[in-house]
């Protein structure tokens, strides 16, 4: 992947970067997402995860805020989250 010159990037690194992850409200979903976040940001605070169940309770929306250190890190994190079988969507 071609690097975007620093002056053209919309994100300044390092920075706190929120990511929304949605999936079925099933046991282990939160823990799986926290485990992934910790692999990409060892300083990630699991107790900082914001949780929002859907109205019917079938889905769970999570907001994780990681310390973004590079575009490559964010791209890899998005790929891993998106590829997880419990995840429906990543924003």
Curated annotation (Swiss-Prot):
Identification of the protein by name: UPF0250 protein Lcho_4239
Superkingdom: Bacteria
Listed PANTHER family: UPF0250 PROTEIN YBED
Pfam families: DUF493
Species classification: Bacteria, Pseudomonadati, Pseudomonadota, Betaproteobacteria, Burkholderiales
Matches recorded under InterPro entries: UPF0250_YbeD-like, YbeD-like_sf
Cleaved signal peptide residues: none
Record-linked HAMAP family: UPF0250
Family: Belongs to the UPF0250 family.
């Amino acid at each position: 992947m071609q690097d975007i010159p620093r002056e053209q990037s919309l994100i300044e690194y390092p920075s706190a970067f929120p990511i929304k992850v949605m999936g079925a409200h099933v046991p282990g979903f939160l823990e799986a997402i926290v485990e992934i976040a910790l692999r990409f940001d060892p300083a990630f605070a699991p107790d900082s995860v914001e949780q929002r169940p859907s109205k019917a309770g079938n889905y769970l929306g999570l907001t994780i805020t990681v310390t973004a250190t590079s575009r490559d890190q964010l791209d890899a994190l998005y790929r891993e989250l998106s590829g997880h079988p419990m995840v429906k969507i990543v924003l």
